[in-house]
């Protein structure tokens, strides 16, 4: 059957593709270490699991309002006030089936055919695909490695055209782990305000920061920036709830209303049980969040030091999220590979280590390595990469 043109140009997720390949090799009996996962390796905290069981036992298994349970919206509003000093009303918040769905719904209600969305590179793999599905045009602005993968106000200004509708800011970043400072965000925000460009602020990794770095939301810097920003967030990364699929968006009422109307015709509502679990995530103890953050920071410090000792790898030390994003161009050449993609494929085939090629993130010289797995597995993986390089060099 002939499929719709809008899906013909879709690029499959690089992260999911490598994860599936690793699973296939494992199923065939190979000892594969997968470092492609974009999710914490910890279980969801117990008080959240208990809240979900309680909700089921109390019969909270029916439809909810399309925009989310009022009680969950209230907890999200309290979270914004507590963490960023931001004041939102229920009509300015929508609960979605994960942060990915919040982004998808936002672009569907925001973009007309040919509207442009500025996407800094390296980027999360789904940004350009979601923009294209909504009829939009991704416009890439390169975040240079020597600038810690951050874009400058001058770069942003040069990329804006009469068709520019929005810019995506992802801090802490997937895949690089970089974090914009308040001063850097303010400078980018001033450009957006001057040109009437909506800011889409993806803050899903906000709780995962290291080395004293702090997450700042661009919306908290001024009332004007708040009015021109849609924040995307969720409980997936902070509370190890990736499979529960609860994310949300907060922003101008007209945008949130349009998103809610669209959601009523697509998903009806996020899963009721997961919403009750998310209420417990935000209203309950936050110690598990900090414990996970500390574990990730310990892994980062150990594995970063080991990785940069491998010939051919250079890496900007990340300040957040749970990924390393080293430049592997020289390593690939030393291993006799023409491209980094070929290098990643050889690593999986010969060393049984699954990394994600940076080409899927708009950075073909890099690879993404997730440290959201056990320290033993990480150290073994780096040892295998080292041995692979020694054998190939």
UniProtKB/Swiss-Prot annotation:
Quaternary structure, from the entry: Homodimer.
Listed name of the protein: Aspartate aminotransferase
Family: Belongs to the class-I pyridoxal-phosphate-dependent aminotransferase family.
Single GO cellular component term: cytoplasm
Matches recorded under PROSITE patterns: AA_TRANSFER_CLASS_1
Source organism per UniProt: Geobacillus stearothermophilus
Alphabetized Pfam families for the sequence: Aminotran_1_2 (PF00155)
Gene Ontology biological process terms in this record: amino acid metabolic process; biosynthetic process
Keyword set, alphabetical order: Aminotransferase, Cytoplasm, Pyridoxal phosphate, Transferase
Xref: SUPFAM superfamilies: PLP-dependent transferases
Cellular compartments annotated: Cytoplasm
């Amino acid at each position: 059957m002939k499929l719709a043109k809008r899906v013909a140009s879709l690029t499959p997720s690089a992260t999911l593709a490598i994860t599936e390949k690793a699973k296939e090799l494992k199923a065939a009996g190979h000892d594969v270490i997968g470092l492609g996962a974009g999710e914490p390796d910890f279980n969801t905290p117990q008080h959240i699991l208990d809240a979900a069981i309680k909700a089921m036992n109390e019969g909270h298994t029916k439809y909810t309002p399309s925009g989310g349970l009022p009680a969950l919206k209230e907890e999200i509003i309290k979270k914004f006030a507590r963490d960023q000093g931001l004041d939102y009303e229920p009509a300015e918040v929508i609960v979605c089936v994960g942060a990915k769905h919040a982004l998808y719904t936002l672009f569907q209600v925001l973009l007309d055919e040919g509207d442009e969305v500025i996407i800094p590179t390296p980027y999360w793999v789904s940004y350009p695909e979601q923009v294209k599905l909504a009829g939009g045009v991704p416009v890439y602005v390169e975040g240079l490695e020597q600038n810690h993968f951050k874009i400058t106000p001058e770069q942003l200004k040069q990329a804006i055209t009469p068709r520019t509708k929005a810019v995506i800011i992802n801090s802490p970043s997937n895949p690089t782990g970089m974090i914009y400072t308040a001063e850097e965000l303010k400078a980018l925000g001033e450009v957006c305000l001057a040109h009437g460009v909506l800011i889409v602020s993806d803050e899903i990794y906000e709780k995962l920061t290291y080395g004293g770095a702090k997450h700042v939301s661009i919306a908290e810097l001024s009332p004007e920036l708040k009015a021109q920003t849609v924040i995307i967030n969720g409980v997936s990364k902070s509370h190890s709830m990736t499979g529960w699929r609860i994310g949300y968006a907060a922003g101008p009422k007209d945008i949130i209303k349009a998103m809610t109307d669209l959601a009523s015709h697509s998903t009806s509502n996020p899963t009721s049980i997961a919403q009750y679990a998310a209420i417990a995530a935000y209203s309950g103890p936050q110690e598990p969040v900090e414990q996970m953050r500390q574990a990730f920071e310990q892994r980062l410090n150990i594995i970063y030091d080991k990785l940069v000792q491998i010939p051919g790898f250079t890496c900007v030390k990340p300040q957040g999220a749970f990924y390393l994003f080293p430049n592997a161009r020289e390593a690939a050449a030393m291993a006799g590979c023409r491209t980094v993609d070929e290098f990643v494929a050889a690593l999986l085939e010969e060393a049984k280590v699954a990394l994600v090629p940076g080409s899927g993130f708009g950075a073909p010289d890099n690879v993404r390595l997730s440290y959201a797995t056990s320290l033993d597995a990480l150290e073994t993986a780096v040892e295998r990469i080292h041995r692979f390089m020694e054998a190939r060099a």
